[in-house]
Each structure stands twice: as C-alpha cells, then as structure tokens.
Amino acid sequence: MRASQWFLVTQKETPNDAEIASHQLMLRSGMIRKLGSGLYTWMPLGLRVLRKVENIVREEMNKTHAMELLMPSVQPAELWQETGRWETFGGQLLTMKDSNQREYCFGPTHEEVITDIMRNELQSYKQLPVNFYQIQTKFRDEIRPRFGVMRAREFIMKDAYSFHLSLESLQETYKDMYQAYCRIFDRMGLKYRAVEADTGAIGGSASHEFQVLAESGEDLIFYSDASDYAANIEQATSLKPLKANQPCNETITLVDTPNQKTIDEVASFLGIASNQTIKTLIVKGKEHPMVALVLRGDDELNEVKAIKHPLVHAPLSFIDEELILKTLKTPLGSIGPIQLNIPVIVDHHALAMPSFVCGANQADKHFINAAWERDAKYDDAYDLRNVKEGDPSPDGKGTLHCCRGIEVGHVFQLGDKYAKAMNASVINEQGQLQTMIMGCYGLGITRVVAAAIEQHHDEHGIIWPQALAPFQVNIIPLNGARSQAVKEQAESLYQQLKSHGIDVLLDDRNERAGVLFADNDLIGIPHRLVVSERNLEQGCVEYKARISSETQLINLDKVVNFIIELINK
C-alpha cells in the first residue's frame, strides 16, 4: 500500500475525552472516529487490524471443527421471554417495536436465538455434539460508555455455542475451546491469564475468563506464585484458615464506645488493630427478612460470593439503618452476632479468630474478648470475603499475588439453563426425549484490539505485536521526490517484500522526515526501513524495530531476507 493513495490521517494532540491509552492512540492514529456515545466508525487503518484479529479467531475456531453461521442482530422478544431474560437482563437490553407493535431487542448475545434454531433442527442424539460460531455486531445499552471501543455500546464479538447430551461431551468441547482461545492469544502475541470466573448473567456451572494483563485493566486477578491457580476477584478464594487451637480464656467484657460507628473508629478508640474486630452486615434474606453476614474487620465483603449462599437474597440488598433500628432495636454501628436473633453467616477468616471485638447490640457499646461458640452462635460458615495479596493459594501451593487485566474472552459450561427453559430436546439412545446441555464461548473482537494497545504502547504510540499490525513493514524514502535513486530503490524493496506476501506500507508522502518517523511510531508498524541518498552511497538501508530505539544499516542485497527472517521468527 502506498501512503499517498491511502487514507492516513493522524493527530498530534490527544483528544480531551479520551481517558486511556488505547482510546487516545486509536483516535490519534486514525484507527477509529466517534459517531455518537459509545459508537465508533472503524477507519481503513483500524479495520486492517480488526480483520487480522477476525482471521486468527476464525482459523482457530475452524480447527476445532466449529461451524460458522450468521444470526440476525434483531431478536424477537418472545424468545427472551421464554428464558425470563427479557425482564432480568436489565437496562443494557436495547428494545424496539416494529410497525406492527411487535417487540424486539438488538442482540447483546445470542443464547436464545441459537437454542431456538437448534430445537427445530436437531432431533436425534446422532446429530450431537455440534458447535456453531459467528462473528457479528452486538449492542449493549451502556449507561456510561467510556474508554473508546473498550466499553462501547456497539461492538463486534465472536460467540460460539455447543450442544451435547452428556456432561463429558460438554467438558471435552469446553477443553477444546479453552485451548483454542490460548492459541488465539498466543498467536496475537498477548500476555494473558485464563482465570476462574463467576458465570454472572449468562449462567451455568463453570467458566473461565481470558484476561489480557495491563495496568489500566478494570479487573483484579489473583494468581498463585507456585501453581497454575488464577481467578478474578469475584471468584478467587484462599486456603481456608484453621480454627484457633486454644480457647479464649479472657472474660467477655462490655465496654463503652461513644460515637464510634466504623471499624476504624472503634479500633482506634480501643487501641487495637482492625483485624482484631469483626463487622456485622445486615442484608435481605431469601426466607428471612434479615440475615447477618459477619467478616473480620479488615476484610471486604464479596457480594458475588454472598448471593450464592442459599439464605441470601439475590441481588444483594443491604437493609437500611432505619429498618435495622426499628427491627433489631440497635443502631447500625453497634450491631454484633451475640444474641442477634436472625440467621448469622460467618466468614471462615472471622470464625478462625480466637477472640474478637464486636458490637454489643446496644447503642455506643461493644464487647471485647468475645469468642465463637462460648459467646456467639452462628448458622453457617461460608467464604464471604475478597481475597488479599499474600493470602495462601487455595490449592496449598504458594501465595496469591494480584495484577490487573482486561477481559477479552469468556467460556461457559451452561448446562441445561437455556435448553430446559426453551424445551430444546432430542431423542437419546434409549428412544426417550432428553434435554440438551450447552456451552457458550465469547471473544470480544473489538475489545482485543484496544487491549493489545493497552499492553503494547509507549509515549510515542502503539507497538503492535506482529500478527496484529496493520502493516508489517514501513518503507520511508527520504527526499524520494527529488532523488530518483532513492525513489527507485524504495519501489524495488516495496515490490520484493510484497511478492513474499508481506504487508508493506510505502510512505511516499511529501513530508519532512520527522513527520514520517513520528507517524510510523504512532501507528506502530513493527519494522521500519529508511532509504536515503547517504545510506545508498554505502549500499545500505537503515533498519529500526518499533520496539527498539536502536538503528542498524543492512546491506541492500540482504535486506529482503533480513526482513523475512524477522517476520517468520
């Protein structure tokens, strides 16, 4: 491609509304242009990258024998009403009516559609297992779209769906897709982790997220330094602590704590550390109006874990202070588990404390030297807390460390959630109707592009991994308009590299060298060749890798093979 014939428009200044590096650099390099809130046009440069992502994904999906199809973006409401998600999916579901007042949504995902197709197409166990995928535009009506294409309202996803009759078959396909995702991100040159994850609104029994590691990532990931264990903050657990061996021999004592309402205030007032206290949170229960969740004072409640307890209502709902005072006759800052008279669920780390300070269920009073069993009773012990850096890994191997990541893929073992709701069954080997079970496998095509930039950039611009770069090589002829020798040599290199199937940009624009070099760094082309009169006098061209600050001279008769070897590494 010749730059003079290409739509290459870059910006020096960073747009004011671009908060993160990928958003800034995609706008400055001319990859995208904003149309509206969370809506972006992919310009020719950005589309080249997007297509490379799609091609890698498509190749690896085809290797798993998944079959590509394309489903409608607009979906009938009645399909979503069958599964109950029309009401529960929330405000991100963009709904509409046609001229006959029939309701539809613009699909944020396609579980209902694919299940409807398969319940009509599949009749026998002999047709299973099957796995279908599509690469298609989705829409989620984000209240606050931000970070460019990282959290846009319209985006492109690869979503795949598999159908099975046995858990063993589902697990086999799940493993194949998991490995395919690993190959995809390996080929893209991304540093990532596959982590255990909560199934969330999609549902199911097991899932993994694929997280591209980046300091700007919104997700917290915990991983062991001595094993393969890794999980996101919602799902991460640590080794269950042992209960104290020695009983508390100190006498429980009631003390005044005037106007001390928070854990930090109580701990400071009593001259102790916050990890010597416990806190009691009152939430709505499934069968009881109120349930108490008890954690160590320095721990944070993990709401995703909490709502998985059978006594806790989902979504999690904290009881307001006025109702607590009216019902429990205790102000919020003085609540504790002793004689509380509502179900008490205690976190394992709080239960392991030999003694603790807690609210006394009297205004401005706390107990010191309180102990479980002797003084405080509980209904169940449960993992309620967010893990912390330095916690022991749950597999007993090493300690947990924390990093940030950007979720770019998510695989689920759905089970029969959708098939059962939509009556998707086939005849099994015994001649009986059996509900199918499903897996689903999502990968954010547009998000991968932004995540790659977040991981691969510097102060000058993007540093593309070779597999994703819009062009692999940029040839810059200096003063090509005035020097026939420079022009001819640049053209010769351009044609030779093209003949070897290499994506080459010949930057033949009539611009100053500084502008051409700056644009190359901004766009992030991995390999730069500079053809100049001075270098030609030495029989060389100048080579520079985008990832390096060093330049080197390469003999003209060796430069093509030099580039080919670099690209094929």
From Swiss-Prot:
Its EC number is 6.1.1.15. It is an enzyme of class 6 (ligase). PROSITE patterns: AA_TRNA_LIGASE_II (PS50862). The keyword Cytoplasm applies. GO terms for molecular function: aminoacyl-tRNA deacylase activity; ATP binding; proline-tRNA ligase activity. GO terms for biological process: prolyl-tRNA aminoacylation. Its main location: cytoplasm. It is found in: Cytoplasm. It holds the Pfam family tRNA-synt_2b. InterPro entries: aa-tRNA-synt_IIb, aa-tRNA-synth_II, aa-tRNA-synth_II/BPL/LPL, Anticodon-bd, Anticodon-bd_dom_sf, Pro-tRNA-ligase_IIa, Pro-tRNA-synth_IIa_bac-type, Pro-tRNA-Synthase_IIa_type1. Keywords: Aminoacyl-tRNA synthetase, ATP-binding, Cytoplasm, Ligase, Nucleotide-binding, Protein biosynthesis. GO terms for cellular component: cytosol. CDD domains: ProRS-INS, ProRS_anticodon_short, ProRS_core_prok. It catalyses: tRNA(Pro) + L-proline + ATP = L-prolyl-tRNA(Pro) + AMP + diphosphate. Disulfide bonds: none annotated. Belongs to the class-II aminoacyl-tRNA synthetase family. ProS type 1 subfamily. Consists of three domains: the N-terminal catalytic domain, the editing domain and the C-terminal anticodon-binding domain. Catalyzes the attachment of proline to tRNA(Pro) in a two-step reaction: proline is first activated by ATP to form Pro-AMP and then transferred to the acceptor end of tRNA(Pro). As ProRS can inadvertently accommodate and process non-cognate amino acids such as alanine and cysteine, to avoid such errors it has two additional distinct editing activities against alanine. One activity is designated as 'pretransfer' editing and involves the tRNA(Pro)-independent hydrolysis of activated Ala-AMP. NCBIfam families: PRK09194.1, proS_fam_II. Homodimer. This is Proline--tRNA ligase. It comes from Legionella pneumophila subsp. pneumophila (strain Philadelphia 1 / ATCC 33152 / DSM 7513). The lineage of its organism: Bacteria, Pseudomonadati, Pseudomonadota, Gammaproteobacteria, Legionellales. The gene is proS.
